[in-house]
Amino acid sequence: MSARPIATCVVLLLVLGGSARAEPVPAELRARVEGLLGAYRAVTVAEWRALPPDAAQALESVARDRTALPTWRARALAALGVVRPSAAAPLVRQLAMDTTAPVVLRSAAVDGTVSVLGAAAREVLVPLLRDPTPAVRLRSAQALAGSGPAGCQDVAAEARTGPASDPVARTAARCEARLRETVPPVR
């Protein structure tokens, strides 16, 4: 057999069979992860953390799967942020900015930015305050507001540029009230 057909077979195996370094997730673990993703109740952070490290691979697979239910993808992304934040970080960035992704999935990505990206969350969240989707603007404003005084200032600055009925403006009003409560009066 010549080198060309062998190379073609190797490429096909890699494309169809996935990465050579990624071990398949055991069926029992995959079933456990899918059970949590499909639960009718809220799954606690402790339950996600109790999963073995291999669960991150299954969660990432679901979060990336465009054929999976958007709610499952959103839950998988949120859980991945708990189980392995380093694996969730690129997905959070990508999905938060993807205007073609379902709103529930974008919202989950935005909700996870602060916990997954830390200080780098601001560079993702601030531009989203101008997103065409109101739910994404609201979630971005809430995430920034919850991140501290600097985030509140970002929300307040953006709110000054839009209508008072915008979700960013409503969040900014609460933010500014909180800032006034925490800043001691000047004497």
Predicted features by range, described:
Residues M1-T8:
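Bacterial N-terminal signal peptides that target proteins for export
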Residues E23-R32, P52-D65, P85-D98, G118-R130, ...:
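Amphipathic alpha-helical scaffolding segments comprising HEAT/armadillo-like alpha-solenoid repeats
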Residues A31-Y40:
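HEAT-repeat alpha-solenoid elements in large eukaryotic scaffold proteins
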Residues Y40-T44, P70-R73, R106, R137, ...:
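Residue-level detector of extended alpha-helical repeat arrays and alpha-solenoid scaffolds
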Residues T44-E47, A76, A109, S140, ...:
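Conserved hydrophobic register position within alpha-solenoid helical repeats
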